[in-house]
Amino acid sequence: MEKLGDDELGLIINWVHDHNDRRSISQVCKQWLRVEGQTRLYIRVLEAEVLHNFLPRFPNLVAFQASGLICNAHLECVAQTCPKIEVLNLNTRKMHDDLDESDELSGLNGGIHAIANGCRELRKVYLRRRGIGNFGVVSLLNFGKNLTELDLGRCNRITDQALEAIGYATSLCVLNLRCCWLITDSGLAMLANGSTARTLKKLIIAECERITDYGLSCLQQMCCLEELNLAECGPAVTDIGGVAVASIPTLKWLNLSWLINISDVTLTAIAEHSQKLTVLDLTGCELITGEGVRAFVDHESLEELVLVSCVNVFQSDVELLVLGSQSLKYIKLDKRLRMWIPIATQENISRFCRLDWTS
């Protein structure tokens, strides 16, 4: 029997999906080890310290993930070794205290610059909690012309300078700026006046407390925005900004959680103008009342509504909305309300949509 060529072996490898099986075979077949490395498209790195030892086996990776400690030198290695990477996922759940001093001062800006320069096919980049600053973001946008998703959540060094660069992106669809608390209305204006306004479908600016009504009014220029998260943007957001957001006709998903100066005025505007809206989260909006909730009785597309910690919304308002709506499928309420709503009423509501309770 003739020895299998690399092409034939590559076809066989594509049929072996279990990672344990792949690892077992690679331990007894050097050719398999080599070819499997060349055909691997995705890798998740648990210990970046040994990255230099094994990464050269995988020159054709298109997706790279590392949620643990990583430094600029590691990213430079990735950029040099794997130029075909399209998806870079460095999201982490916490900041690491044991960074090198140079990395602690600059975040991963140097490494991200190397990635942006070396991996020109980047489409999706996730950098949550990685301390990226303006230099890293500008590098990504200068080199990454195909970028569609960018997660900068909790990168609290980001300022309006980064948003100016993002505004020039021509293919960006998803942008997460959660808790980037240095950004202001000026940054949102640059986003709304740039090329991004014609492509962005999902924008998260939750916990950005320097945003005001003026910044939200700029978002009206985003012609295809479908998802908007404004949770905990602070008291500077009022009904003026809420009404402006309501005028975005493409909105399908809207989170207004804990905007304490949003009232029924905003809800009435949303019910009237946001005809494509399917999900609305009003958690902690203390000023809204049953009048605002009842405005959605005739809304034709609303499917999910969250009314947690809405102290001025009562049983009769919820019942009227659910029984009158033709589209509502899910409603979430405070658990404290449960004792005040008769069992018969709860059962009646549950006939038309799923009733969920939170503590």
How should these model regions be labeled?
Residues 148-152, 157, 161, 167-168, ...:
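Alpha-helical scaffolds that organize eukaryotic protein assemblies
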Residues 28, 118, 172, 178-179, ...:
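The N-terminal extracellular segments of secreted preproproteins, especially immediately downstream
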Residues 97-105, 109, 117-118, 142-143, ...:
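C-terminal capping region of solenoid repeat domains
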Residues 48, 66-69, 90-93, 130, ...:
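Solvent-exposed loop/turn tips at the surfaces of repeat/solenoid architectures
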Residues 1-128, 133-141, 159-160, 164:
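N-terminal adaptor-interaction module of cullin-RING ubiquitin ligase components
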Residues 39-41, 62, 76, 85-89, ...:
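Structural register of leucine-rich repeats
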Residues 45, 63-66, 90, 127, ...:
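Conserved beta-strand positions
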Residues 78-92, 178-188, 221-226:
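Conserved long hydrophobic alpha-helices within structured protein cores
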